[in-house]
C-alpha cells in the first residue's frame, strides 16, 4: 500500500532553486508512496554504463531522478518499492555484502530509514562508507574522518558511555573506537499502514512510570537544592563538577527517520530513559511557530504536500528535534519524520497544498485527508454526517462519500471559525499528559472510524483486529538468505513481499503468496502500459526499475530488486547486457537461482483467477436441456449492445432469434447494427430510460447480456471514479433490468444472463459486483482463440462457463492468418486493442505490427476485424474513418470467446 514518506528534508537552509524544485515535485510528480521510497525520498534511478535495449521513459519525469538507459522507472499504485542500491543520508551508495542474520540488529534501510540514536553525527562525514549486513549498517573504520574529529568524538563517546550505564558498550576490535557513530540500540520498528497498536493498559503503565520518574527527579532536585543551601559555594561547585553533563543527541533534519514505538525495557535502563523523558527543557521554543498539536502540511522531496500533526519527541521514541525542525506525525499511516519549519504550512493553507491528482490516484493520501479533516472538524465543532458500514470495502467507500463535504468545507476556509478553530486544545499542547489517544487505538478505528464517544463499553480482546505483520524489503532479504542456507522452505514465505502469512502458492514460480499480494496480482497481472508491457513486476506486482522481456510475443517485466534477490546478485546487470534477453517465463531453463518456474504455470494461472473468490454463493440454478420438439426461438435483451456481437454469434451458432432488444447510445454502433442485421434489432436508446413497464411490454426474455463501460472501473485509468460514480454506476442499471427480466416465481422456463467487464479492476469493485450478481466471475483471455490478448471477467449462469477454452479450425490464432496478401506479421499475437490509436503499436520500441514493402505498417481495419473474429468489412458503413472503426472494435467483445460461452444454448432454443 502506498505509503507516506517519513524522512526529513535534507537542508534547512536550501536555496530558492531547491525549494522551487521541491514545489514542482509535489505538483507534477505523482509517484505512489512505496515502502522503500519512504526510506529514500530522493532516490535516484540506478545508472548503467551501457545503453540497453530496455529503454523506457517514465510517464512523469522527476526533477531529481536522472534517466536510466537500461532500466525503466515504474510507479505502481499499491506496490512496494525496494531499491537495489540504497542511498545514505549524504547521498553515498551503500555497498552490499552477503546478508548475515543478526538478531536484534537494526535495519539501516528499513521503512523510514531512521538512524538509531547517535546516527545524526554521521552526517558530518562527507564520504561515509558502510557495508550492509542483513540491513545493518556498519561504518568502516576511520573512513573519511579527520583525525581531530575522530579524537574529539572518541572522548565524547567515553564520557557518554559513563552516563549511559547499561546502554554503554566497550568499543574495541570492531572498529568502533575510531567511529563517529555510536552503536545503535535495537529498535522495534513498524511499517507503513495502520498505526502500531498499543493497549491502553500498557500505555497507562508507561505514563505512570514517566510520572513517577518525574516526581523522583523533582525530589532529587529539591534535595540537592536543600544541600546547596547548607553547603558553601566551594562545595557546591565541586558537586556540580562531579557530575558530567548528559550528552543529548540532536536529531539531524537531513537524516531519514523511522516511526518507532518505545519498548518496555529493563528497570535500570527504564529509569535512565524515563529521566531523559522528564526533561523540563521547553520544546519548539525557537519562536518559529508550529507548536505541539498543530495540524500542518509537510513537504518532502519528491512528494506532494502531506497532512500531519506536530508531536513531541517523546511520542516518537527518538531524541529531540534540532532547532528549526519539528517532529511530524503523518496522517494516513501514523509514521514520524523530522521536518524543518521552512517545509511546513498550517492546515489552513488547504487551497494551496491540497493536490487533487494525488487524491484521485493514491488511497493513502485519501485516507490522510480523511483523518486530518476529522480532527479539524472535531476541533472546529463542525459536524458532518457519519456513514456506518460493516466491512472494509464499504467503509472505504463511505469515507469517499464523507470526504467530499469535508474537503469543500476545507477549501472554503474552514468557516465559520476559520484557522482559529483549528488550534489544538490546551491539553494537547502539554506533551506529558495523556493525549493523542486516537493514535493508539486499534488500527481500523484509527483509519476510518469517527472520533469515539467519551465513554464506551470495553471491548473484549477477541473483538480487536489483529495488528498487521511487520514486513519490509529487509525481511524478505533475511528470509531469502535463510532459504539459501537451507534453513527455510521457499514455499513457506511470500516471494513477493517476504510475509510469512502465506495463503496460497505463487501461480508462476515456486514459492508462497500472501493475501495482500494475491489482491495486487489479481489487479495488476493483466494491466499493461502504453508500450504493451505489464505495468508491474511479474513476481511482486511492484518495482520502480524493471527489465522488459526481449521476446516480441512476451509482455512480462521483472523488477531489478526481485531479480537480484531471487536469481542472484548481479543478475539484473547481466540481463541488461544480454541482447535480446528472454525473461524467466520464456527462457529454456526452468530454474534461475531460487526462481523456479512452475511446469504447469498456464493451468495454475487459469485456476488462480478461477478460484480467487473471497465470497461463496449458492450455485446457479441448473436448467435441464429442452427436448428438441419443445425448443423455441430465443428472445434477447442486450444492454450496452455495441456493434451487436451477441446477435452475430447467435446467428453463427444457428440459433433462431425471435426478438433482439438492444440498448445503445453510440450512433456509429447503432448504424453498424442496423446495416449488418437488416433492421432486425430494436434499439431502445439509453439504458437509464428503460423501465420495468418496458420490460414487461417487450418480454419475456430468455437471455440478458451486457457489459457496462469500463472507464471508471479499470485501474489503468488514474482518474477512475469507481463503481459508484461516473460510468461505473451503469452496472446498477444492468442489475436493475436483470432483476426486472427474471422469470416470476413458479416459472421454470430456462433463463440465462451474462455480464462482462475488465480484469484490471479493483478487488473491492469486483467483490461488490459479485455480491450484487450473487455469482463469482470466470476469467477468459481471448489469446487462446484469437490473435490478440484480451482478458475479461464474465459473470453469468450460462452452462459450462468454467469449461476449458478450446479453439476451432476456423479460429485465427496467429496474426499472420489475419493479414491481407503481401503483408508480413512481425508478431504472432498483438496486445489488447483499445479505442486509442497507439494501442496498435507493439513492444517496448513501439513497432507497428506489420511489415509491407520493406516498411512497417499499422493494422488495416479489415485485419483488425479478423483479429476480433468479425466478418471482413463488418464495420465498414457510412464512410466511417479508420479511427472511428477502431473505436467500435476496441469496445466490442471477441467473437470466438462469446461463441464459446453461447454454444451450450443450442440445447435450449430452436436452431435453424
UniProtKB/Swiss-Prot annotation:
Residues 494-586 are annotated as: Interaction with the PRC2/EED-EZH2 complex. Highly expressed in fetal tissues, skeletal muscle, heart, peripheral blood mononuclear cells, kidney, and at lower levels in placenta, brain, liver, colon, spleen, small intestine and lung. Coiled coil: none annotated. Residues 634-912 form the SAM-dependent MTase C5-type domain. Changing residue 882 to H: In TBRS and AML; somatic variant in AML. Residues 47-57 have a biased composition (Basic residues). It catalyses: a 2'-deoxycytidine in DNA + S-adenosyl-L-methionine = a 5-methyl-2'-deoxycytidine in DNA + S-adenosyl-L-homocysteine + H(+); L-cysteinyl-[protein] + S-adenosyl-L-methionine = S-methyl-L-cysteinyl-[protein] + S-adenosyl-L-homocysteine + H(+). It is an enzyme of class 2 (transferase). GO terms for cellular component: catalytic complex; chromosome, centromeric region; cytoplasm; euchromatin; heterochromatin; nuclear matrix; nucleoplasm; nucleus. Residues 17-40, 149-167, 269-279 have a biased composition (Basic and acidic residues). The modification Phosphothreonine is found at residues 124, 261. Activated by binding to the regulatory factor DNMT3L. Auto-methylation at Cys-710 in absence of DNA inactivates the DNA methyltransferase activity. Residues 199-403 are annotated as: Interaction with DNMT1 and DNMT3B. Residues 74-83, 246-260 have a biased composition (Polar residues). Residues 292-350 form the PWWP domain. GO terms for biological process: autosome genomic imprinting; cellular response to amino acid stimulus; cellular response to bisphenol A; cellular response to ethanol; cellular response to hypoxia; DNA methylation-dependent constitutive heterochromatin formation; hepatocyte apoptotic process; methylation. The active site is at residue 710. A zinc finger (PHD-type) spans 534-590. One of its GO terms (molecular function) is identical protein binding. Residues 113-128 have a biased composition (Low complexity). Its EC number is 2.1.1.37, 2.1.1.-. Belongs to the class I-like SAM-binding methyltransferase superfamily. C5-methyltransferase family. The PWWP domain is essential for targeting to pericentric heterochromatin. It specifically recognizes and binds trimethylated 'Lys-36' of histone H3 (H3K36me3). This is DNA (cytosine-5)-methyltransferase 3A. It comes from Homo sapiens (Human).
